[in-house]
């Protein structure tokens, strides 16, 4: 009896199973998606980097006039980038709200489906466990009945032998 265990020893479902949102979008995909949504921001960052590199080169050369020009260009490029960020944020705000609502609804339906699968799995496990316990109880009752039957048989045989020896 020590070796008998529940018939289904598979692990129970986990709350981390099938978390598609966690695995859907990697970093590169997210960068490309953001680049497609707002292509002027990387352009502004590139202009800023170009202006900083130009300013550092002109500083090494000692050309103060070009250094000041590149620093002004850097300022304009950064202003352009910030303006594009603000305008892009205003433009994409409605889309982001819709996307969040959609993702929230999708997550809710997936959560409900996962919960339903979890409950079905638990119900199946419970039924299996009840059936296993019932079989085990029948087996132990059968062994007890069998043991009782042997005891009764020994008692009957003893009574017969007493009756035979006493001559009844």
Swiss-Prot record:
Which BP terms does GO give this entry? mitochondrial respirasome assembly
Keywords, in A-Z order:
Coiled coil, Membrane, Mitochondrion, Transmembrane, Transmembrane helix
Q: Which residues form the HIG1 domain?
A: 12-103
Q: Which Pfam families match?
A: HIG_1_N
For this protein, the record's InterPro entries field holds: Hypoxia_induced_domain, RCF1
> What GO terms fall under cellular component here?
mitochondrial membrane; mitochondrion
- Assembly and interactions? Associates with the respiratory chain complex III/complex IV supercomplex.
- What function does the entry list? Cytochrome c oxidase subunit which plays a role in assembly of respiratory supercomplexes.
User: What family name appears in the similarity comment?
Assistant: Belongs to the RCF1 family.
The name this protein goes by in its record: Respiratory supercomplex factor 1, mitochondrial
Q: Which organism is it from?
A: Phaeosphaeria nodorum (strain SN15 / ATCC MYA-4574 / FGSC 10173) (Glume blotch fungus)
Q: Which gene encodes it?
A: RCF1
